[in-house]
Each structure stands twice: as C-alpha cells, then as structure tokens.
C-alpha cells in the first residue's frame, strides 16, 4: 500500500504528524471490517443482542489499550463508553455517539440481513446505514487516534448506545438520569444529516440541527365479531380502513420554524426564478401566501418534512384467526411533529376528524417529551468546524443547519445542554436511502467519505488542525478483506 508522503517542511514548522500522516488505506479497511463484523451480530428489535456488539467493540479497545466503561440497563442491552484524554481539561469534551440496535428485518430481502454481503461496491446488511456504519466509522477513527503520539486539546468520547428514538429508555435517557457524570460532554456528533448531492445543481451539506418530535397514536375501530362465513356490515377492519382513508386525506397545516427559515433561505440562490419566488413567498409573504407556497414546496418529499407533520400507519392488528372476524381492529400511527407543535393540540385535531363516529377511538400511546429542546442555529464552534471541513471536502457546496425528518437521540443531548449536530454519508439520490428497507446497504465509497468527513471535523475541532491530505486513498481488496470475529 502506498502511503501519503510526509512533508519535511511541515515537520520543521512543528505541526503535529496528525495533520498530514493519516493512513487512509488502513482507516478505510478498518471501518469496512468493523461494519461487516457488526452487521454479523444480530442487534435487531424487539430483543437486540447489544451486549454481543459491545463485546466486539471493547475487544478492539483492549487491543488498543483504551479504557472503557459498560452500562447495562437490563439483560441483553448495553451502553459502551470510551475516552481519549485531552490536554486542556477546561475545554468541554466532544462525544461521538451511535446506537447499537437496528430495526427488525422485514420481508423482501434478497441478501441475508444478518450476514454482511459485499457486492458491486456495496455492503449489504441490517444496520448498514442505520446505524452500524456510524459505529464502524467512529470505532476505526477512535482506535487510530489513540495510537497517535499527539493528544487532542479536549477529551474525545465514543459512546455506543442502547436504543434510540422510542428505545432510548435503555440508552441516552437512562444514561442521562443514572450515569451522566461519566459523560458530561459539551458537544456531540451523531447520526441525522448528510450530503445531498447535486439535487439543486450543487452539493448541500446538511447538518442536522433539530429533529422532529416522535409520537405514536393508536386508532381502534369497534365492530361485531362473527364467524367469517356470516359477514356483517360493521366489520371492524372495514371501519378501520375508512378511518385510515380520512387520515390519508388529512393535510396538516404548514409551519415555518426558524430552522426551516434558515434552510430555505440558504438554498434559495440555487433555485430557478420560479423556485426563488416561491421561497420568497414562503419566507416573507402574507400568511395566505406562505401557506400556498408551502403547499407547492411540500410536493417535494424532503421539503414536506421541513414544513409539516408527517403521519405513517405502521402496525396493524385484527383477528388472529382466518375463520373469524374480530370485534376490534387497530393501527398504530407513527407521527413526526415539527418541534414547535403542541402535541396535545395536534392529537385533539386528529380526534376531531372522528368526533361523530362512536365506533372509532384514538389513544396517544407515546407522547413527545416537552418542552422540546431549542434547535442549533449554527453560531457555535462545532458548526464552524463542520463548515470548515465541508469547504475543504466539497469546495462548491453550501453547509446549512436543517431539521431531520426523523427523531433520535439528539433531542435528549440538546435537553442536557449539549451542542449536537447530526452528520452522515451521502443522502442522494434520496430514493436510495435504504434504512428500514429490504437489502439495506451503504456503498463503500460513501462509507469512506463519511469517515473522511467525520475525521476532518474531529481534527479541526478537537486538535485545532487540518487533516491533510483530505482526499482518501482507497484500500486494496486484500486490505479490506474482513476479519470475522467471534463473540
């Protein structure tokens, strides 16, 4: 493998070898190896074997003489924390965080979900993009940093957490209540953003500065349960389908949050004349013009998430027998609310859709925790490092704080006062976002690009140095051949 040249003149100026001697071939190979090995450990819901994934990670820590702590909220669940000490204890630590669990594997996979497959430049398997790629990237970078002679200015923490979104009661929520004194970070990088490629003629570096609020609502329809050979008109499934049709037709009003204002203002110069006019109405028009402009913008699926609440039916329940109808049928609606929404008012609005229907009931199964944390506004030093690194990697891109369509751990960190941004791999084309889909994958190029971006930010923020050269050196096939580790 060819190594990057070490520049003697830079050495003479006293710049740390960290600034230019990065061995991208080794780093890329390690990230790929870790991702493959982590995919091969089943950490899928509802009973994720996170302890086995944690065991794999702390074995890597042991090999590299890294101290670690493990926090186990209950059997099978685990949170693993490691630290690289900085030279200035007055600087608040930087936390690199990823979650160990994955969604369950649904139907339709052509590749084995629990065994990584490398094919056509892609790595297939459950968690490839949500979020074992983050764990693999952080682990490769963290172990490499520990073996360098120079220390960072501030502590760097790596937390492989248990659960996220509605599963955070074993992860960050639990840690914040029971073990936050072990973490006490001031800044954090997590999942949630990415690089949107050429959608509007240029690259957009999307730094997740806010999430949406997570809410589950259960709709239940009540009918008459009978033998299936003697059907009746008030079949609960038919009644539920009619209720779902109402939900499908419901169009939540648009809200223009401060984060959305920043995002649309940043992308306005990239639009054609019609697009610029629409965004101008959205940001500066009368309330009526704003709503009209929002409806036009919401035709784009991603823009819709920035302006409106979204509702997705997920779990259906009815009769368990093929020869009988149930007296009840229900569906769980997973709802992502804009951060300035009153959850109770939104729930009341949904209830009002069925106020004249006695056979339909709504229950808020999971309510968002309020008050919701204030979004990041991009005025802090961590965002400055994100922007500095993005300008080097993507010279013609714009870097903008924006809102993630999903929810996650970032809201819990922000509630603790931690300045938190979400960053990830390329997001384009958006149709190739395979998280929670059959044959989930990440391309090797995107994995290496994610590593390069995160490494550049860490160097800029924690070391106060450029990471040069920023261009990656691709590992050979032999270097990226995975070592499968048994747990």
PLM features: what roles do these ranges have?
Residues 11-21:
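Hydrophobic h-region of N-terminal signal peptides that target proteins for export
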């Amino acid at each position: 493998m060819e190594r990057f040249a070490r520049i003697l003149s830079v050495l003479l100026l006293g710049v740390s070898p960290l600034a230019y001697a990065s061995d991208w071939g080794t780093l890329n190979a390690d990230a790929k190896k870790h991702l493959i090995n982590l995919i091969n450990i089943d950490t899928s819901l509802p009973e994720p074997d996170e302890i086995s994934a944690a065991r794999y990670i702390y074995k890597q820590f042991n090999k590299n003489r890294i101290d670690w702590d493990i926090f186990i909220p209950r059997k099978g669940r685990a949170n693993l924390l490691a630290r690289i000490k900085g030279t200035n204890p007055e600087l608040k630590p930087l936390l690199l965080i990823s979650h160990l669990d994955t969604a369950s594997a649904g139907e339709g996979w052509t590749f084995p979900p629990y065994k990584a497959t490398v094919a056509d430049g892609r790595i297939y398997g459950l968690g490839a993009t949500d979020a074992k790629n983050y764990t693999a990237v952080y682990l490769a970078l963290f172990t490499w940093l520990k073996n360098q002679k120079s220390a960072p200015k501030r502590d760097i923490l790596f937390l492989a957490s248990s659960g996220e979104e509605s599963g955070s009661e074993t992860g960050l929520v639990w840690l914040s209540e029971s073990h936050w004194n072990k973490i006490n970070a001031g800044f954090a990088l997590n999942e949630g953003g990415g690089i949107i490629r050429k959608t509007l003629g240029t690259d957009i570096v999307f730094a997740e500065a806010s999430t949406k609020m997570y809410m589950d609502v259960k709709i239940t329809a009540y009918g008459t349960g009978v033998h299936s050979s003697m059907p009746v008109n008030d079949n609960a499934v038919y009644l539920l389908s009619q209720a779902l049709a109402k939900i499908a037709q419901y169009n939540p009003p648009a809200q223009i949050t401060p984060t959305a204002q920043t995002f649309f203002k940043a992308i306005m110069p990239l639009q054609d004349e019609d697009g610029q006019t629409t965004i101008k109405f959205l940001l500066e028009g009368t309330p009526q013009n704003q709503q009209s402009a929002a409806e036009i913008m919401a035709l784009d699926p991603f823009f819709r998430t920035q302006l409106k609440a979204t509702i997705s039916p997920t779990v259906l329940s009815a009769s368990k027998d093929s020869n009988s109808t149930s007296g009840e049928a229900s569906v769980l609606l997973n709802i992502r609310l804009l951060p300035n929404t009153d959850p109770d008012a939104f729930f009341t609005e949904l209830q009002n859709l069925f106020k004249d229907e006695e056979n339909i009931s709504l229950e808020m199964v999971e309510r968002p925790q309020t008050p919701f944390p204030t979004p990041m506004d991009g005025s802090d030093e961590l965002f400055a490092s994100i922007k500095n690194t993005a300008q080097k990697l993507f010279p013609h891109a714009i870097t903008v704080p924006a809102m993630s369509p999903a929810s996650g751990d970032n809201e819990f960190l922000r509630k603790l006062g931690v300045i938190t941004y979400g960053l990830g791999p390329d997001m384009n084309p958006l149709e190739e976002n395979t998280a929670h889909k059959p044959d989930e994958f990440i391309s090797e190029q995107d994995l290496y690009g994610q590593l390069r971006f995160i490494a550049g930010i860490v160097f800029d923020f924690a070391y106060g140095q450029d990471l040069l050269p920023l261009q990656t050196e691709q590992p050979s096939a032999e270097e990226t051949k995975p070592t499968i580790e048994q747990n």
